[in-house]
Amino acid sequence: MRDRMFKSTLGFGVLSLLFVTLQASATEKVKQVITINNGSEVTSLDPHKVEGVPESNVILNLLEGLVYTDVDGKSVPGVAKSWSNENFTTWIFTLRDDAKWSDGSPVTAEDFVYSWQRLSDPNTGSPYSSYLQNAYILNAGAILVGKMPATALGVKALDTQHLQVTLSHPVPYFVDMLSHTSMKPVNKSAIQRHGDKWTQPQNFIGNGAYVLDNWVVNERIVVKRNPFYWDNQNSRIEQATFLAISSEVSDINRYRSGEIDISNSAIPPVLYKKMQQERPNELYVRPYLCTFYYEINNQKAPFNDPRVREAIKLGLDRETITNKIIAQGQKVAYGFTPTFINNGNFTLPNWANLSAEQRYQRAKDLLSQAGYNKENPLKFALLYNTSDQNKQQAIVAASMWQKNIGAQVTLQNQEWKTSLQSRHEGNYDVARATWCADYNEPTAFLNMMLSQNSNNTTFYNNPAFDALLEKALIAPDPSSRHKIYQQAEALLDKDSAIVPVYYRVSARMIKPSVSGFKGNDPLDYADIKRLYINEPN
């Protein structure tokens, strides 16, 4: 407002100028600073070393890819101002002339070549290396298994402003995949100078709307506006702080005390109704392309027996968990992929129509066939990462499995970073998990279950499933692709690879002083450049 008012009064007399000065001073009293709870300490700020939502929430503001998602979840130009394609296979991206790194140097096509090659390089060890393969970028699969060098990846700088990407198959939704954290560029010179320490505030060079200012591990990350960002004139928040509060109860209590402006996206049931009554206008509940489920270690005995996995799946009362315990608008999940995703709307599996008692009896019969009974009950550990809500749900789930199918379940708690490591290493039986879409299309979920996917911590391996997703790529239209996705989802259910529980909502508290949040993006990105602090009336 101050800039607009100042320009409109140029040429007026001293009194007008004095009036504007006083108005500007009043406006400046509104500090454009914001505090957001991010729910956990991040594992890293290197986009090629992370896989979780807390990390993406921060990196989203520090680095910008070829495109980003707007307030409605649509892909819009980021570093790339335009693009074209030939049969959805060869893509040409034209970069902005004014796209710059936070040190003032230009962002070029070669930066994306370097970054994507780094992502594909097995030496990087990225948990998201398979994303390039899922996007069907030429030679990505061979590079990931060491058969070809990273330089063979199908990405090429035609000149400083034009990037060519070649795919092995047509991918109509390829552009929508490019806003993902792993596809953002990293600064080659910063990495060469500082190695793994390039993400420290004193070394960080980014190209996003904000730059890393301070990082106190297990406490806070502070970012400030990047004056070199191409659209900096439309950013209003000057400084943002991300807190690492894992306790949802502490999160809401600190929100109520005024310390936090935007809470994390999960409100504990014990406080949800209280917030509905006390502050209904500050409570935002929106659909979220995220599935809460229990992950089963498919390669570990006895869970390599599909009868055991199906019994665990059928023995959980997901309806009670969803509608009575959490009860914030979540939808009961009978499959992995949310039914409201683009090209979704999947048919429910047959067991979804069984009564609870019918499901439990079927589960007991399966366990009996697998050699389990009252004298020899199924025993397993349930791993969950630190969180009040995760703990409560784990206690409830363990109780249900004991009551409904006679299983003996012990609880195992680990911090976020440690739990991720345990799951990747296969050091678990059953684990609490949430998978959130990387883009709005069923493959954002289904690809995770591919046998060679680097995110596949269930260790599910079915060549027939892999073949279905390969077949979907050559489907002639969205309707044909949807039918194949339905078959893939049905196969996941038949194999009982996971225990789906519910499709999440984003439930968060937002102070009335914060504007710019619309909540229409089902990916629920925490994009600070959209926000601003209201001026007092």
Language-model region placement:
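Ligand/substrate-recognition segments at binding pockets and active sites
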Residues: 217, 360, 364-437, 478, ...
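Structural transition elements
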Residues: 331-369, 387-392
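Gly/Pro-rich hinge or "lid" segments in bacterial periplasmic/extracellular proteins
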Residues: 74, 141, 146, 150-152, ...
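Extracytoplasmic/peripheral linker and loop segments enriched in polar/acidic and small residues
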Residues: 92, 356-357, 407-424, 444-512, ...
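N-terminal lobe/hinge region of extracytoplasmic solute-binding protein
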Residues: 37-87, 203-206
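Alpha-helical secondary-structure segments
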Residues: 108-115, 160-166, 170, 208-209, ...
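Extracellular/periplasmic solute-recognition and catalytic clefts
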Residues: 213-224, 241-300, 323
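Long beta-strand-rich cores associated with HINT superfamily self-processing modules
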Residues: 508-537
